[in-house]
Amino acid sequence: MNKSKEAETDITQIFPNLDILPKKFSAKELAERRIKKLHVAPGSIFMNRWSIEGVIGNGGYGQIFMVMDVKKNDERAMKIEPKLRAEVITKRMIMEQQVLMKMQGKTHIPTMYASGFNDQFNFIIMQLLSMNVGDFRKRSPLGRLSKETVGRIAYQTLNALKDIHDMGYVHRDVKPANICFGVHAQNRHILYLLDFGLVRRFKTESGVCIPWRINAGFKGTERYVSVRVHEKLEQTPWDDAFSVLYTAYELVVGELPWRYLEDIHEIHGVKKLMNEVTKNGEMFKDIASILVDFHKMILECDPVVELPYEKLLECLKCLYSPKSLLEPYDWEDGYKTTLNI
């Protein structure tokens, strides 16, 4: 994939009515979201290089800004994380920096242009991407995406995870909010996996599996983690694959069966019920039925054995065939494919 400046053509030059960039929050929206403190001020210049254009993301672990490289006149994204949280040094972004550095050059990993820290926060300057696929789903008139689009999202996500797993890491936080696409004509159909703050090694650089902890704790987002994570077992690539399943289910149906449950034990119970093949018919009815084979295939895998990636990818390819990865996604055709389901 050519990432040179000369090769980049703004996608809006080809699709002038296509709005795929993450939205910058207004002052009113920042107040409504109770964002009391911005660690850098819009309009300021960070490190004599990056002009702060506005806030495009905010979460429990930090903030994301759209920035302009004043030397190259290119838009980028800057992610920051306070160095201290509740008087404790935070290490989430330090891990993310390390993993991103090792993964540079992989198709589904965003380009990192700079990283470091000052006396207040750690930061990463990276490639500017589209809004996440969860937001694309919410924009759909039906609140869901077509099976052709979801199949290609799941296929590319699993490919991204294979690269990460091959490096000896499990992601542990696969979900729609961490999946985006490129914003240039050359990469608008390329999926990028984000947020490596929860990654953990499951094998050494030489390929030796790391011994499991007796109690691995709970890491991830409740809605998208596997049954094994609820049971505080050590996570493996198998658990990442289950998060792909839950992500695909939410995107194609519009919501997960446990969407309105708040008790983590109840969520665990519904997920266990879904895994009982003889009882999951109700949860895989209608459009969700397209995911039955993928679900069964993961269940047949041993969590301690390497995933049969090619077999799983072929299963996902059936969801979008005969379309290709390079054909328009739902948000490019005004969600016409979704409306024709």
Swiss-Prot record:
Protein kinase domain: residues covered: 50-326
Enzyme's top EC category: transferase
Catalytic activity annotation: L-seryl-[protein] + ATP = O-phospho-L-seryl-[protein] + ADP + H(+); L-threonyl-[protein] + ATP = O-phospho-L-threonyl-[protein] + ADP + H(+)
Sorted UniProt keywords: ATP-binding, Kinase, Nucleotide-binding, Serine/threonine-protein kinase, Transferase
Top-level division of the source organism's lineage: Eukaryota
Gene Ontology terms: cellular component: cytoplasm; nucleus
Active site per UniProt: 173
InterPro entries listed in its UniProt record: CK1_Ser-Thr_kinase (IPR050235), Kinase-like_dom_sf (IPR011009), Prot_kinase_dom (IPR000719), Protein_kinase_ATP_BS (IPR017441), Ser/Thr_kinase_AS (IPR008271)
Pfam families reported for this sequence: Pkinase
GO molecular function term, any single one: ATP binding
SMART domains registered for this protein in UniProt: S_TKc (SM00220)
One record GO biological process: signal transduction
Residue positions binding ATP: 56-64, 79
UniProt cross-references to SUPFAM superfamilies, sorted A to Z: Protein kinase-like (PK-like)
Family affiliation: Belongs to the protein kinase superfamily. CK1 Ser/Thr protein kinase family. Casein kinase I subfamily.
UniProt protein name: Putative casein kinase I C03C10.2
Native source species: Caenorhabditis elegans
